[in-house]
Regions:
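Acidic, metal-coordinating helix/loop segments flanking the phosphotransfer/catalytic sites
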Residues: 32-48, 52
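The C-terminal output helix
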Residues: 114-130
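Conserved acidic carboxylate
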Residues: 8
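Alpha4 helix (beta4-alpha4-beta5 surface) of REC/receiver domains from two-component response regulators
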Residues: 62, 78-100, 107
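Two-component/phosphorelay signaling modules centered on CheY-like receiver
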Residues: 11-29
Length: 136
């Protein structure tokens, strides 16, 4: 089963995207904060992570290391708000993240979620320390 984890404080957007994913047969897990979302990754394997750029408080390299430890091989799509500059989008792309600008087509997100061939289970032993360090 394809699962998407959405880490975003914008509840209206997450519910809208979540309903559209549900219509496509994709399970969705929602988190309001970055730390809550990372903790969800320890409990539930996912196929794709949709992360609001506003929820990120780590430098790009540390963010990439964290997701590589907690959810290796899982694509991370960063949602960049329309008002943010192109440099914000490029910053995430340089660290290997996919970036979508607002507004974005939910079907494009669904297509990204369907691409992975398998759901990767988290590595709880290595991930616990990474989560603790990121959520201090």
């Amino acid at each position: 089963m394809t699962r998407v984890l959405m880490i975003d404080e914008n509840r209206t957007l997450t519910e809208s995207v979540g309903m559209r994913c549900f219509e496509q047969g994709i399970a969705v897990r929602m988190a309001d904060t970055f730390c809550e979302g990372v903790r969800h990754l320890l409990e539930t394997p996912v196929s794709l992570i949709l992360l609001s750029s506003a929820a990120v408080h780590l430098p790009g390299a540390e963010l990439a290391r964290l997701f590589d430890t907690v959810a290796p091989g899982v694509p991370v799509v960063v949602r960049v708000e329309a008002g943010q500059g192109m440099d914000e989008q490029v910053r995430f792309e340089l660290h290997g993240f996919l970036a979508v600008r607002e507004p974005f087509d939910v079907l494009d997100l669904v297509a990204k979620a369907e691409r992975p061939a398998r759901v990767v289970a988290p590595r709880p032993a290595a991930a616990a320390a990474a989560v603790e360090a990121a959520c201090r």
